[in-house]
């Protein structure tokens, strides 16, 4: 066997560089999977499918959307975190993607350490909606009605510790009223019960309730964003309605499992941004109630950190734990 000289050993790293670069350049070598932690037709699913086609063209491989609903998004989000094939990304929301471990210390993953932010795809303002029988046409009137009827107003959420729950609890604490929390497993069922009058109020993500607002089945009192929402421009903000409330905005993020190479994340983030910049995709999502973003990884990382600080504090203060 020939012995390598000192000079030959020194040259080895340089000789290996082209091979390493070539291996990185060939990624992806097979189809890419996007796990969506919610069912088909949900807002996270719509966001994933909005980038799916462009990503497939840009990456030169099929991109498959794999819906993994259940557990309020935690089951699918854990599947994203646990993927080890190097070809898996995932779409989830705040809660499963940020404060999940604070709400449930027994959760099988930690969003902060087991997920790598790729792109903040979109934001969705919340809308305070009520059944038409509620004698309130502004958020301030709703607060006054709730104060005059302590414990007699029921409101929906999509589960303990979700934004729809925390937004109402935060407003109730600030304004000094009590209401009965009725958690649901799905937005659709909560909206059906609101339309039927079985509950009186709901902080709903805009994309899940726009048709009912437009058809007059529910009354929109205020949006929770800092500015009016273009999809329903006649609905004022909470502050315009006379209620002291910080903005509450849902978000949809694209993540990768921890350990995914930074170059891969940067590439997918850039292509996701290009996909969402396409006019046709943008218009379709805006019509569905989205505020389209398509950010760099740093923006999503900051959003997760903000959620942990703000909403994590409320979860701890209220002593919230998941159902069951």
Task: Please place each PLM-identified region on the residue numbering.
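Paired acidic/hydrophobic, glycine-rich loop segments that form the ligand-binding mouth/hinge
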Residues: 87-92, 200-204, 220-222, 312
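Short loop/turn segments at beta->alpha junctions
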Residues: 5, 72, 138, 183-187, ...
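Beta->alpha turn/N-cap motifs
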Residues: 91-96, 157, 187, 204-209, ...
């Amino acid at each position: 066997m020939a012995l390598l000289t000192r000079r030959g050993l020194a040259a080895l790293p340089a000789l290996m560089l082209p091979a390493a670069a070539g291996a990185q350049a060939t990624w992806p070598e097979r189809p890419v999977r996007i796990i969506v932690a919610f069912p088909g037709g949900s807002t996270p699913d719509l966001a994933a499918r909005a980038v799916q086609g462009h990503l497939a063209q840009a990456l030169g491989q099929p991109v498959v959307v794999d819906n993994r609903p259940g557990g309020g998004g935690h089951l699918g989000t854990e599947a994203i975190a646990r993927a080890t094939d190097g070809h898996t990304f995932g779409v989830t929301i705040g809660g499963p993607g940020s404060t999940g471990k604070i709400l449930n210390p027994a959760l099988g993953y930690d969003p902060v350490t087991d997920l790598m932010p790729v792109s903040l795809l979109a934001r969705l303002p919340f809308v305070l909606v009520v059944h038409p029988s509620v004698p309130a046409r502004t958020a301030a009137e709703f607060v006054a009605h709730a104060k005059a009827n302590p414990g007699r107003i029921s409101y929906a959420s999509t589960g303990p510790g979700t934004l729809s729950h925390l937004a109402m609890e935060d407003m109730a604490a600030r304004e000094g009223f009590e209401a009965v929390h009725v958690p649901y497993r799905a937005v659709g069922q909560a909206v059906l019960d609101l339309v039927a009058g079985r509950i009186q109020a709901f902080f709903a993500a805009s994309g899940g309730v726009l048709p009912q607002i437009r058809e007059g089945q529910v009354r929109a009192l205020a949006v929770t964003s800092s500015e009016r929402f273009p999809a329903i421009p006649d609905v004022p903000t909470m502050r315009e309605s006379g209620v002291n409330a910080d903005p509450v905005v849902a978000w949809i993020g694209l993540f990768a499992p921890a350990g995914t190479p930074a170059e891969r994340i940067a590439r997918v983030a850039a292509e996701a941004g290009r996909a969402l910049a396409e006019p046709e995709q943008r218009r379709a999502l805006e019509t569905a109630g989205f505020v389209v973003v398509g950010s760099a990884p740093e923006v999503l990382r900051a959003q997760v950190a903000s959620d942990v600080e703000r909403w994590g504090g409320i979860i701890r203060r209220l002593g919230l734990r998941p159902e069951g």
